């Protein structure tokens, strides 16, 4: 039997069954139930504080709401599609538990400010959780960086070998990306942490409510100072999905590198059995499913951002049913970012091993030290552009002769330019090439060591909302 709608007394007929199903959001907004109960408890206490209901009535409402919370947690509260949404489902069950006093809970409140409150409480908690997961991801990066401060790896531009760098320097670049993500979410949290409770349907209420009282109970920092804006604002959700998209961009870039590094063509890392899968037909395969899935799920989060932007672009003030569509995009975006952060953290912690011998060979078998030859000449007083052009010719002739720069004899160097001396070999040795780049933020070992100390200091600061 279909439950009577809370608003149905205005109507003579009943909803068509197809429209009941089409209209219902209980299938996904049940995700908000814990936050709905928390918001309702604060609202009930505010109603008593302002004398709108008696303290005894508030106690009864709070007790009933806590009972529903316990029923939900133990699997004994499972509202069906006929309940329409989580708000009506809770109110109906509350009235069953406490009687007619349950009908007073919605005094001075609309579903519009109620759902806005729920979503903000939900997202605030999710932001806190995601920020901690970013910290876990950063810790995994730091752990590898500590172990590989002096491990060399080819640095690339245009996916062509450019200059050798410290592997730790490479990993700490992702630490910095994640740090921006962490800070960005902190800023968004502040704009999420504003209470719309008490805005009513759109115009406020005639009851003598105290919006700051309920906001304080819910740990909101502020209240909306315009009721129309309070019930219709979803900027915070769009901002979150923008930040989530950037998190996924960073995870996807790292994933792409992991996929390349695990290939036989690069062979920079080995995937452990804990984070790789096999082929159904090719027994030799070990597939990098984790980074491939992260790369694939990135587009999913981008899609949710586009969905929210498109949803909001044409909505007149204040609330419109379209806003029901914000939740599935937001919920799935949150879940996707969280599982991707968790999976990449596990991959870094237990799923990869760097092949240091292969990396050492990789930085010694190319011309990525050519810039250092030009720098060498420039340090001898030769204009850099002249030195640059000369080294280009050296590389060209060396390639034709099948030689690397390290293979040239001192005589051959001096035939190219008399400024070359025996110390050219030290200058172009991969370890020296890296060590010499000690400008601030560079890949020189001392600079990377300082960056590592700074990264560890950030992680040691456990007040992660700062």
Curated annotation (Swiss-Prot):
On the tree of life, the source organism's domain of life is Bacteria
Pathway field of the UniProt record reads: Amino-acid biosynthesis; L-arginine biosynthesis; L-arginine from L-ornithine and carbamoyl phosphate: step 3/3
For molecular function, the Gene Ontology terms on record are: argininosuccinate lyase activity
Q: Which CDD domains match?
A: Argininosuccinate_lyase
Q: Does the keyword DNA-binding apply?
A: no
Gene Ontology terms: biological process: arginine biosynthetic process via ornithine; L-arginine biosynthetic process
Q: Which Gene3D superfamilies match?
A: Fumarase/aspartase (C-terminal domain), Fumarase/aspartase (Central domain), Fumarase/aspartase (N-terminal domain)
EC nos: 4.3.2.1
Record's keyword terms, sorted: Amino-acid biosynthesis, Arginine biosynthesis, Cytoplasm, Lyase
InterPro entries recorded for this chain? Arg_succ_lyase_C, Argininosuccinate_lyase, Fumarase/histidase_N, Fumarate_lyase_CS, Fumarate_lyase_fam, Fumarate_lyase_N, L-Aspartase-like
Ranges annotated as spanning the membrane: none
- Presence of keyword Acyltransferase: no
Q: Where in the cell is it found?
A: Cytoplasm
Q: Which reaction does it catalyse?
A: 2-(N(omega)-L-arginino)succinate = fumarate + L-arginine
UniProt record similarity statement: Belongs to the lyase 1 family. Argininosuccinate lyase subfamily.
Q: Which NCBIfam families match?
A: argH
Q: This protein is called what? A: Argininosuccinate lyase
Per the UniProt record, the lineage of the source organism begins with: Bacteria, Bacillati, Cyanobacteriota, Cyanophyceae, Oscillatoriophycideae
């Amino acid at each position: 039997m279909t439950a009577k709608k809370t608003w149905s007394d205005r109507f003579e007929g009943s909803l068509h069954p197809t429209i009941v199903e089409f209209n219902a959001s209980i299938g996904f907004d049940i995700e908000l139930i814990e936050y709905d109960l928390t918001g309702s408890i604060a609202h009930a206490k505010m109603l008593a504080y302002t004398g709108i209901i008696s303290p005894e009535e508030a106690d009864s409402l709070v007790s009933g709401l806590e009972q529903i919370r316990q029923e939900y947690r133990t699997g004994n509260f499972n509202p069906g599609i006929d309940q329409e949404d989580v708000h009506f489902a809770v109110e109906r069950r509350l009235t069953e538990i406490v009687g007619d006093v349950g009908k007073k809970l919605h005094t001075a409140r609309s579903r519009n400010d109620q759902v806005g409150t729920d979503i903000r409480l939900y997202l605030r908690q999710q932001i806190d959780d995601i920020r901690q997961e970013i910290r876990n991801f950063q810790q995994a990066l730091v752990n590898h960086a500590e172990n590989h401060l002096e491990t060399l790896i080819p640095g690339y531009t245009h996916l062509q070998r450019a200059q050798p760098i410290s592997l730790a320097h490479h990993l700490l670049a992702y630490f910095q990306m994640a740090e921006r993500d962490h800070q960005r979410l902190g800023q968004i949290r502040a704009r999420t942490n504003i209470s719309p409770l008490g805005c009513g349907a759109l115009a406020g209420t005639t009851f003598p409510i105290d919006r700051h009282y309920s906001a304080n109970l819910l740990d909101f920092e502020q209240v909306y100072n315009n009721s129309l804006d309070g019930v219709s604002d979803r900027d915070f959700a769009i901002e979150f999905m923008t930040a989530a998209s950037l998190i996924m961009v960073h995870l996807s870039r790292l994933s792409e590198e992991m996929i390349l590094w695990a290939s036989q063509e690069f062979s920079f890392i080995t995937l452990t059995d804990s984070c790789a899968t096999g082929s159904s037909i090719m027994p030799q395969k070990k597939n990098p499913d984790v980074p491939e899935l992260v790369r694939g799920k990135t587009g999913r989060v981008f899609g949710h951002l586009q969905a929210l932007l498109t949803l909001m672009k044409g909505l007149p003030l204040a609330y419109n049913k379209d806003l029901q569509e914000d939740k599935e995009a937001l919920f799935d975006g949150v879940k996707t970012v969280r599982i991707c952060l968790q999976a990449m953290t596990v991959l870094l912690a237990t799923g990869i091993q760097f092949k240091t011998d292969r990396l050492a060979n990789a930085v010694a078998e190319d011309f990525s030290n050519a810039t250092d030859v030009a720098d060498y000449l420039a340090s001898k007083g030769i204009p850099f552009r002249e030195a640059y052009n000369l080294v280009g010719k050296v590389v060209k002739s060396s390639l034709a002769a099948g030689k690397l720069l390290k293979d040239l004899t001192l005589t051959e160097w001096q035939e190219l330019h008399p400024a070359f001396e025996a110390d050219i070999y030290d200058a172009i040795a991969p370890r020296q090439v890296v060590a010499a780049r000690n400008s601030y933020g560079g890949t020189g070992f001392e600079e990377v060591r300082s960056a590592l100390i700074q990264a560890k200091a950030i992680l040691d600061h456990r007040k992660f909302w700062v």
